[in-house]
Curated annotation (Swiss-Prot):
Belongs to the FARP (FMRF amide related peptide) family. FMRFamides and FMRFamide-like peptides are neuropeptides. The lineage of its organism: Eukaryota, Metazoa, Ecdysozoa, Arthropoda, Hexapoda. GO terms for biological process: neuropeptide signaling pathway. It is found in: Secreted. GO terms for cellular component: extracellular region. Keywords: Neuropeptide, Secreted. This is Extended FMRFamide-2.
Length: 9
């Protein structure tokens, strides 16, 4: 779970 990747989505 990456919160940074979540911001990218």
């Amino acid at each position: 779970s990456d919160y940074l990747q979540l911001a990218r989505g």
